[in-house]
Amino acid sequence: MSKQVGLIHSLKDGQSYMEIWPVRKELNAIFPEQRIIKATRFGIKVMPAVAAISVLTQMAFNNYDSLPQAIVVALFAISMPLQGMWWLGSRSNTKLPPALASWYRELHQKITETGFALEPVKARPRYKELAVILNRAFRQLDKTALERWF
């Protein structure tokens, strides 16, 4: 990543990247995004409850000596989905390696050849642009057009 971004900006980018990335089984073997997205969504649902339970059980059993450890466990549990969103945010702003950049250009060309309007091809695409192109390809291209890549 050539340009440093702040933590809050990276978390927001991660949230939007979770929505943009196409959740398709064909992409599982190539990209780790789907596994990270699945774990992050699970963490968003479950980890606040884990954090609350870890603190409340110590309080319910009057075990106030272990409360500091329970608070550390709660903070760790709450930080897990944030770590996933941070990773996704920094990944979305990372420039594509040359092989993936050429794949991005091929997909972009294939979509524009079929008559669909797209924004101009980026000179140095990022994973964010690849996600948009993959989404568009899965929605608008037929299976025979996608056979070459998947």
From Swiss-Prot:
It is found in: Cell inner membrane. Keywords: Cell inner membrane, Cell membrane, Membrane, Transmembrane, Transmembrane helix. InterPro entries: UPF0208 (IPR007334). It comes from the Bacteria. One of its GO terms (cellular component) is plasma membrane. The chain crosses the membrane at residues 42-62, 70-90. Coiled coil: none annotated. It is a multi-pass membrane protein. NCBIfam families: PRK01816.1. Belongs to the UPF0208 family. This is UPF0208 membrane protein VIBHAR_02941. It comes from Vibrio campbellii (strain ATCC BAA-1116).
